[in-house]
Curated annotation (Swiss-Prot):
It holds the Pfam family F-box. InterPro entries: F-box-like_dom_sf, F-box_BR-signaling, F-box_dom, KIB1-4_b-propeller. Residues 6-58 form the F-box domain. It comes from Arabidopsis thaliana (Mouse-ear cress). It comes from the Eukaryota. This is F-box protein At2g14290. Transmembrane segments: none annotated.
């Protein structure tokens, strides 16, 4: 039997390729479309299987010889995928859907689609924003519109005493956001933030909520139309989240340690400018990705997807807890296949956005 001609794979007829693509999982679909030009063209005529659940991006500890990171789909608990891209010396700062914000060892910033070769180079970092000796403290938030390719990048430099800057598609510089100088005392500082579209929601040092519109031509605009409201919280293990309607929620995490293990539970509150607050017992048909602070449609509605606290403050040591909490049944799900993995970090993301 002769050796198969490798060219024949790229010359398969479109109808046969379409039949193949229809049978592939979401991950294999995106792998297949970068095999060659013809496969990529055929993939555009095929609708991939719909993603119904958030995924985990896993970052292993220690030396990673091939520079890859791992992908975990909760619907396929026994499968862990490895990216084909080379990510040695690169830090993942934030994500929006399948797009991730990265910084490399030369301090270059860019956005990538983890399932394709698509890449967006960002503006060079300005010395006035970043002290490169403290670049390990750089964190960020990202929003990408899949339909229009518009994007917003928010960067947090050298916290807790540092700067905030942002850029959006078409900008030729980073715009600084003052946190103290010229800012009313209740709206000064930052301990938590959520980016939803062009709006940045900041929880200030005194736990007031500051809302910024980043879409203006002049840079940004404070849009607190009413008296800014204060978040009442007696615990540090809490985060803000924002609904699709722009309502700010407070999410509290409580870890109960016992002799037989630990159990984590969550409480969500709305009308958070009042005391006592109103507890939320349902998220409708949406789920909360707490590392992003936003709600999305999901196969598991009323669920909270959790990895760790601290979106903004980068810490060398923190406790990862990869779990999903059902708000209705008050039950917690962890993943046995990940229990023995040594990870330095993990992020939930939603490939289907």
């Amino acid at each position: 039997m002769g050796t198969p001609n490798p060219r024949t794979w790229s010359e398969l007829p479109p109808d046969l390729l379409g039949s193949i693509f229809h049978r592939l999982s979401f991950t294999d679909f995106h792998r297949a479309k970068i095999v060659c030009w013809n496969w990529n063209l055929s993939s555009k005529l095929t609708v991939p299987k719909k993603i119904r659940s958030p995924w985990l991006m896993l970052f292993p500890e220690g030396d990673n010889e091939d520079g890859s990171v791992l992908l975990f789909n909760p619907e396929e608990e026994e499968k862990i995928y490895k990216t084909k891209r080379y990510f040695s010396g690169i830090r993942f700062l934030a994500n929006s859907g399948k797009w991730f914000l990265l910084i490399d060892s030369l301090f270059n910033l860019y956005i990538i689609d983890v399932f394709s070769e698509n890449k967006i180079d960002l503006l060079p970092l300005e010395e006035s924003l970043l002290d490169k000796e403290e670049s390990e403290d750089l964190t960020g938030l990202l929003w990408v519109d899949e339909k229009t390719a518009e994007y917003v990048v928010v960067l947090f430099f050298n916290f807790p005493s540092g700067n905030v800057g942002f850029c959006k598609k078409g900008d030729d510089h980073y715009t600084k956001i003052p946190l103290h100088c010229g800012v009313p005392w209740r709206l000064q500082g930052l301990i938590d933030a959520v980016l939803l579209g062009y709006r940045l929601y900041i929880r200030t040092e005194l736990s007031y909520i500051r809302i910024l519109d980043l879409s203006t031509q002049q840079g940004f605009e404070d849009v607190n139309k009413y008296e800014p409201f204060q978040v009442f919280s007696s615990t540090q293990d809490c985060s803000i989240a924002v609904t699709t309607r722009g309502e700010v929620l407070l999410v509290k995490s409580i870890l109960d340690n016992t002799t037989i293990g630990s159990h984590r539970r969550f409480c969500i509150f709305k009308n958070i400018d009042y005391n006592p607050q109103e507890e939320v017992d349902s998220l409708g048909d949406e789920a909360l990705l707490l590392n992003l602070g936003i709600l999305l449609p999901s196969i598991a509605p009323n669920s909270i997807y959790f990895t760790r606290h601290g979106r903004i403050y980068h810490k060398e040591h923190f406790n990862l807890d990869l779990c999903v909490f059902n708000l209705e049944t008050k039950t917690l799900k962890r993943f046995p296949s990940l229990a023995n993995m040594k990870l330095k970090d993990a992020q939930w993301f939603f490939p289907g956005i």
